[in-house]
Structures are given as structure tokens and as C-alpha cells.
From Swiss-Prot:
The record marks H233 as: Plays an important role in substrate specificity. This is Serine hydroxymethyltransferase. It comes from the Bacteria. GO terms for molecular function: glycine hydroxymethyltransferase activity; pyridoxal phosphate binding. Homodimer. GO terms for biological process: glycine biosynthetic process from serine; tetrahydrofolate interconversion. Its main location: cytoplasm. Pathway: One-carbon metabolism; tetrahydrofolate interconversion; Amino-acid biosynthesis; glycine biosynthesis; glycine from L-serine: step 1/1. Its cofactor is pyridoxal 5'-phosphate. Its EC number is 2.1.2.1. Coiled coil: none annotated. Catalyzes the reversible interconversion of serine and glycine with tetrahydrofolate (THF) serving as the one-carbon carrier. This reaction serves as the major source of one-carbon groups required for the biosynthesis of purines, thymidylate, methionine, and other important biomolecules. Also exhibits THF-independent aldolase activity toward beta-hydroxyamino acids, producing glycine and aldehydes, via a retro-aldol mechanism.
Amino acid sequence: MTTAEPSKTVQAAFRDTAIFDLIAQEAERQRVGLELIASENFCSAEVRAAQGSVLTNKYAEGYPGKRWYGGCEVVDEVERLAIERVKQLFGAEWANVQPHSGSSANLAVYNALLEPGDTVLGMDLAHGGHLTHGSPVNFSGLRYRVVGYKVNPETELIDMEEVRRLAHEHQPKMIIAGASAYSRIIDFAAFREIADEVGALLFADIAHIAGLIAAGLHPNALPHAHVVASTTHKTLRGPRGGVILSNDPEIGAKIDRAVFPGYQGGPLEHVIAAKAVAFGEALQPEFKDYAAQIIRNAQALAGAFQNRGYRVVSGGTDNHLFVLDLRPQGLNGTKATRRLDANDITISKSTLPYDTEKILHGGGIRIGTPAITTRGMKEADMERVADLIDRALKGEDVKAEVHAFAGSFPLP
């Protein structure tokens, strides 16, 4: 990887060459590599400029108009703008843009609406769920009694009848609809129907699909869920952070208190400004074109792997990601990741439904198209991407080809 020229430029501009040399190296890594981690993306120069602005200097504990510190007139307007834009984006009546991450947003939801020991029904991690949906090593699994629902062993789709059966059997206080490695449409209306049957709250975690929902390409969770949380990066293409939405003002008030003073102090107003920029970008007509291309690319790439004899979990994808089962190839997620990393192709290993492989390794890999779509790749390019990954998984050295191919697509 060539880093000499960026390094010289950086050294001339900054005194702390140790850090800025590393930043230059990371910029070059991103430029010449293929980024296929489903939860990563490339945000715009305007998003990065807002996040790197003087707003980082301002402490602003509290909420707009109700701050602990003085001098918050400007950041109040920044935060109000972020709130109004995200409400417009998702059709929400209330929003909190202060959570530092998606996990922080989920923590606030739980703290606001649950008591320790309450029963929660969420998607099993091995079947596509998320750590914060009740994993025993996460706060969500340690603090609450969690019951996991799974996908159907034959279709590998969420088994809504099992969700209903478990809900009636365990009477959860909350049902979580959302995933981190599930490639199909989530039926939020069906989840709400089940939640109403047992008197449960419905919490939708849309972190992965938020950009697709914003573009109208996946059903919106908000008309059905009592509360919705998301990250602001991934398919939304903003800075790393979290956001919480609801149409219930009482729930909103509880969550506001859970965020501040519950577990956060000063919000990161420079990040909130970057969120506002990203929300504004997602409100533009061209964002729908971008989101549609993400899905087309994911479907084309999944098809290219199927044509090469790979098994795609659930047989395809309706969103931005899919999971490859690598057990027939004699690989697991850890081995595959190492081979791809050696060729500057980045993916994430993934567990598989009903897999016996240790969860640390996973039986497959999760592949996502948001980042390569941001760089301008189209369906025709997915054949080349699949070819490079296929050959790298078989042990070939394709790094030079990856650099030449990826480097021909600009970063924002």
C-alpha cells in the first residue's frame, strides 16, 4: 500500500505527524481497498467537515432551550435542525439525536421503558440479531430476561408463528424487531399485531436499514413500533452515532430523561451537526436513487456468488446485505476474513442459523454494498467484485487487481 505522498503532505501541514501519518495511511487503505462490511459506508465531505468543526469545543448538557451551560444559542439551532430533519425523514413526531451510538440508543430505550428482570423477546444473535438484542455477554442479556426467536430452518426467514408462540408463552414486556445480519424484509406490522396480542411494547432497531426506509424502499417501522432506534451511519451514510424516534410523546419524555441525565452528559454537538447534514442529504431526491442502487448491487452480487456455487442464506436479499455459507468450501468466517484481509477486501464474519461452528469464528461471511455503491459501482461491476472475492477465498493473491479496480472509483 502506497502512503508516501499523503504522508509528506500531512507532515507539512500538521505537527503531530505520528497521528496524521496514520490518518493518511487509513485514507489510502480506504482508497485502494474493497469495503464490503455491511455496517460501513463513506460519508460526504460536508458530513466530515461538520464533524471536524469548531462545534466540538462547545459543552451543551441538556436539550435545546434547557441547557446547563450558557452560550448554547448556536448549538441549540444545530440540534433543532437535526431533530426536524430526522423527524421529516421518517415521519416521526418526536426524536432524540443525542445518543453517541446505536448501542447507546438501545440502552436508553431499555432504561426508559424496562425494569431489570423484565422479559424481552428479540432475534437470536446466531440467526441475524444483534448483541444489544439480548446477547448474554451484553448489558441487554445481563440485565433482562431474554427469549430469542429464530428463523425457519427451511426458508431461513423470520418465523412469525414462532414469534407469536414465544410471545404468548413468555409474555414479554418488549418485543424487538430488527437485525444485523438478515437479508429480507422485516414485517413490522406483523410484529405489532403480536405485540398487541400480549400487551408488549414493540421496539424496532432499524440501524442497518434506516437509509432504505428513508428512501421508501423498505417498510417504515414507525407507524407500527412504539419506539424506533437507529445508527446514523450504515445505509444513512452519516457520522457514527445514534438516534431514537417515536410518535408517542410520553415515551419520548421518558427516553429524553434516560439519555440525559440518565447515562450521557454533554452531547457531541459537532457529531449532531454532521447528523443534520446527513439527514439533509437523505431528504434529497438523489438519495432514493442511491438506496435503490445499493439493493440492486446486493442482489447482483449475491447472484454472482450463487452462479459460482456459493450458498446464500435465505436464497437471496431484499436489502443491502447477504450472508454466504462457507462451510461447503471448507472455510469458516475467521479463515475467510484472513484471506480477504490479505487482499485488502474487508468483510465481516457471520454466524449462520442452526450452525454448529463456534460463534467466535462463524460459519460464513456477511457482505454489504453501501460503501461500494457510494463509490459509484453498479450491477455490472458486481461480477468483478465476486470474481476477486472468489479467487481470494481460494487462496489466490489478487491484491494488485483489487487496488487497480477499487482505485478507479473515487471516494466522496
